[in-house]
Amino acid sequence: MVRAFQTFKVETLDIPIPQSEEEFHSLKSMGRQGFQAIFTLDLGKDPNFIFRLRDLQESIRIPWIIWFVDDPEGYGFPESCDPEWTIAFCWDREITQEVSLKPSGKENPLIHLPLASDPEVFFAEEIPSILLFPGGVFVGSTAQTNEILEKAIRTTPGFFEDLEPLWGLYRTDLKRSPQTIAWMYLMEKTGLRLDGIQADPLCRLWVHAAVHLLGIWKRRELVSRLIGQGGGIFGDTEWAHTIGALYQGQITYGEELRRVYNHSAFVLDIRQPQARTGLTQRIFDASACSRPVLTEYSPELEILFEPEDELSFFANSEQALELKKNLLRHPEESNRKAMHAKNKVLSHHTYQHRAKQILQVLKQR
């Protein structure tokens, strides 16, 4: 994003989120140094910074632009931010709409801003005659680490037994919201009204933990079924226990990842549970490399792409297996769709496009 802002001749200063008192004091002085805004991706991992954010905003008194690429609730948004000095974006459309319906969200609204790609890093290379991964590739972790949810899963009696029927519902139709499935189950189990249990912090924790586990099961099942002989899986070492020899180790984001994408028959995309409808980085980066993308369905596909002409999407593993066969049987058609997706990314979904959108909103303040 620094490079993207600089293409619009915006002077930028790249600094870390403050931790020491000296760093907090230095940041407070920025408003007097002529800076027009502060930009951050999420709000870091330090709860002390999030706790002090409102005070910082009131001291600096310049717009604070936040682009959430993770669930804003985990950062205490919108209560953690001063609405007078906050311009907040979110990569996920469903989360954006949900937060905006809350009373506090109306005071401090979110703006939907999808992820994008950097065409200076991800671009199509000459396709070799022999691909390194003719069976496709998946790049991603087995699960996003969350100690609170993992502890809830381990210590809640009967949790796995409760989740088995929910998994049976979810795995047959990935268009269904796992959050909705979990809330409906909990409402039926407790016999209480939905608004009542949604106000209960323990019920919210149970639903978050349920969605977390459903997401883990979804990713492991789909990856193990769809990436087979000739394929490769990159990510954390837990994959080695799940898929064995197909595990290729960890990979660095950037040039190394671009090379893997360009040497793969297709790129598999499966969202983490914190992304309800938000499209992942994989879709934009793999498309920028002009490689076929096989992804789970999201309504955002129909907003940001022409799904039938640019991507292949599925709602369950059986559909995904059939689409995979078609991708490999008809490479010319697959590559044609990938080229269309590449053109869409370059014309609408680069970080320069996102920087331009952010600057336009800032200008209107």
Map each language-model feature to its residues.
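Catalytic binding pocket for nucleotide-activated donors in carbohydrate/polymer assembly enzymes
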Residues: M1-I17, C81-D82, R93, E98-S100, ...
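Short, surface-exposed amphipathic charged segments that create phosphate/polyanion-binding patches used
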Residues: E79-P83, F123-P134, L327-H330
